[in-house]
Amino acid sequence: MKIKYLLLIIISVLITSCSSNQAMKPEDFKNQKPRLIIEEYLSGNVKAWGILQNRSGKVTRQFSADLDGKWDGKQLILDEKFVWNDGEIQNRQWTINKIDEHNYEGTAGDVVGTAKGFSYGPAFKFEYVLLVPVKGREMKITFDDWIFMQDERVAINRAKMTKFGIKVAELTVTVSYTHLTLPTICSV
């Protein structure tokens, strides 16, 4: 009986690991529109609102964020200010370099090593390890961070956070490009 359960567990692990090859890839979006050019979209003032969910899906925190990006033709400097619903304020400054049409690299003070970015069509994927404060200490959390352009003003950001390959949390963010002139929908 124990051997059957062990065999079932081994088969489940093998099936799960094989199915991970079918994971979403940035290249899957190469022929879709609108095209997200991250250095253009994040240049200027951008506003974001999001939720943090624990591994079981329960919303544990909410935030709003102000992003201010400056692109010099080679490098994007992105200042982020997060205001959490519990009053915590977090600041991060990203330095993002465009390597070629589809590849980016980024660094920030609380990012371990170099983040890798990939851009195709309306999708931008950012992979990095972030030092996250948890109960008085810092934990290394791996981010699988996706931004999907919806139109010229709005993008949706989903980030899966893992530790040792196990999902620990997920972020869902709505991003709005605030320095475009919006059409007037009613007049007085």
Residue ranges and their predicted role:
Residues 16-17:
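C-terminal motif of bacterial Sec signal peptides marking the signal peptidase cleavage site
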Residues 107-164, 170-174:
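Mature, soluble, non-transmembrane domains
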Residues 1-7:
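Bacterial N-terminal signal peptides that target proteins for export
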Residues 49, 53-134:
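Central antiparallel beta-sheet cores of small beta-barrel/beta-sandwich binding domains
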Residues 178-184:
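Conserved small/polar residues in nucleotide/adenosyl-binding loops
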Residues 29-45:
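N-terminal helix-cap/turn-to-beta initiation motif at the start of protein domains
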Residues 20-24:
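Bacterial lipoprotein signal-peptidase II cleavage site
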